[in-house]
Amino acid sequence: MCGKILLILFFIMTLSACQVNHIRDVKGGTVAPSSSSRLTGLKLSKRSKDPL
């Protein structure tokens, strides 16, 4: 029983890793934005006047 659970967990982790690699290869992005992630194709601009 314990062996089956470990095998299922290993299978799930492998599929998750493959999905992450596929997203990075195909879309050139990251799965979850973080401080080390680079944003591409996004331009952020400041407002010229503060509402306060």
UniProtKB/Swiss-Prot annotation:
It is found in: Cell outer membrane. A lipid is attached at residue 18 (N-palmitoyl cysteine). InterPro entries: Lysis_col. One of its GO terms (cellular component) is cell outer membrane. This is Lysis protein for colicin N. It is a lipid-anchor. GO terms for biological process: cytolysis. The gene is cnl. Lysis proteins are required for both colicin release and partial cell lysis. Keywords: Cell outer membrane, Lipoprotein, Membrane, Palmitate, Plasmid, Signal. Residues 1-17 form the signal peptide. A lipid is attached at residue 18 (S-diacylglycerol cysteine). Its main location: membrane. It comes from Escherichia coli.
